[in-house]
Amino acid sequence: GAVTVHHGTVYFSHFADQRLYRLAPGGTPEPLTPAPGDGTRWRYADGGVDAARHRWIGVRQAHMPGGLVDNAVVAVDVAAPGPGRVLVDGSDFFAAPRLSPDGRMLAWVSWNHPNMPWVGTELWVAEIAADGGLGERRKIAGGDAESIAQPLWSPDGVLYLISDRNGWWNLYRCDVRVD
C-alpha cells in the first residue's frame, strides 16, 4: 500500500500532496520527494525499505502536462530526497516491487494495456548491481493470458507467487537465487 514501517520509522504517501514522507519515532513527518511544481506531479505507493542502501523502493506515477502518465519502479534515497531513481520502466503499469531478504534481488509485477492485472501480468526479477541499479531482467512467470499476484520472498530467498495459469488461483514457488 501507501505505508510501510521499518525499525519504527513510518514511510507513507500523503494523500493531500502525494509526496512520500518519513516519520521517525517522536519526530514530525519529513518529505522525501519534491513538492509539485513544474506541472509534473508524482504519486508513490506499494513500497518498502532497502535498508542496506538507505532508500525506499516502490511504484511511482508521474502525471505530466498534457495528460501523459508514466509509471516506473523507483528508488528514493532517504538521505538525499528527490523524485527517485528509475529502476524499471517501459511497461504501462507496475505493482509489488519486493526486495529479497538478502537485498540482492528485486521482484516486481508489470503489465500493459489493454490488459488489466487480473487478465495478464508478468513477474520479473533482477539482481541489484553495485551502483544500486538493476542488472539483467528475467521474466519468471506470466503473460497475456496469465495473471500473477502477490510475489513474496521467504526468509531463505525463495520467491512465492499466486498465478491463475490453470484457470484457478494457486500458490507457486520459484527458486531464483543467485550465487
Q: Predicted regions: what is each one?
A:
Residues 1, 12-21, 36-43, 59-73, ...:
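A flexible loop/linker signature enriched in serine peptidases of the S9 family
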Residues 5-7, 49-52, 101-102, 154-156:
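Residue-level detector of Asp-centered blade-edge/turn motifs that repeat once per structural unit
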Residues 9, 54-56, 105, 158-159:
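Conserved core beta-strand positions within WD40 beta-propeller blades
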Residues 9-32, 44-50, 56:
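Hydrophobic or amphipathic alpha-helical targeting/insertion segments
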Residues 24-27, 77-81, 128-132, 175-178:
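Short loop/turn segments that connect beta-strands within beta-propeller blades
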Residues 32, 79-89, 132-143, 179:
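Blade-edge beta-strand/turn elements of extracellular beta-propeller
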